[in-house]
Amino acid sequence: MPKPEKEKEMMTAIGLMSGTSMDGIDAALLQTDGEKVTGFGAAVSISYEEDFKNQLRGLLGRDPDGEAHAGAIAEDLTRRHAEAVREVLKESGLAAKDIGVIGFHGHTVLHRPGDGVTRQIGDGALLADETGIPVV
């Protein structure tokens, strides 16, 4: 007789996205069992100002490891994502302790799948420090 499937634990998560359009950050609250999204909550969008967009554009197509200013841009980007998280928390009336995890991939600045190369900027550890929430 097959074992009954173990009930999955529900988690509240915040997902972050900053796409190649470089218009800004989208952040959304969701409920998940780790495999499926079972509910949605507050969502916010934070626009980038033109100066920051230009800084990101300056990294496109380059390996950020070879760019002296990439670290400062990555830190700025990460702090902007932390602000988006704080806005979602404010909109939802939740606190950091109520969130199980933040999904964060940074911002892709180099993507050549044919060569097996992709590079993102962003600092998950800094985001976790800034928000008090684990980051994956």
How should each PLM-predicted stretch be described?
Residues 1-136:
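Short acidic/glycine-rich loops and adjacent helix/strand connectors
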